[in-house]
Amino acid sequence: MTEALHIVCPHCHTTNRVAAEHLASAPDCGKCHQPLFTGHPLALDAASFERHIGRSQVPVLVDFWAPWCGPCRMMAPAFEHAAGLLEPQVRLAKVNTEDEQQLAARFNIRSIPTLALFVNGREVARQAGAFRSAQDIVGWVRSHL
């Protein structure tokens, strides 16, 4: 029997069931017919955060950042590139801590950027401070999976 994973659509936020062996074949959402993986980080607000973290069975790496943060801006291209390298095994997302202050407080974000890796809805790893390259991000994620 084939294992089916729950994957939340980055466009309409519908939860989809996808056979694990079909992850690499660019599956589309059953509702909106858009790609389930875009190769780019998702911008999450509080509602979409709950849906993606709580319902997705694919690990989610979240970058808690702020627009005024120099190290956040420095790491942004590496994080973008890492999304293309890690999907579909890991979804990458960003939370603007200026816009989502309650979410940042809930996760006790004290310095930015902070990366948090969630697996099956639970935080399994955290890194405060910027990574210099996409390869550093990928290596850190893989070391925690």
Name every feature range the model reports, one short phrase each.
Residues 13-16, 36, 76:
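Cys/His-rich microdomains that often coordinate metals
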Residues 18-27:
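Short linker/helix segments within small regulatory modules
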Residues 57, 64-68, 111:
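Short pre-active-site segment immediately N-terminal to redox-active cysteine/selenocysteine motifs
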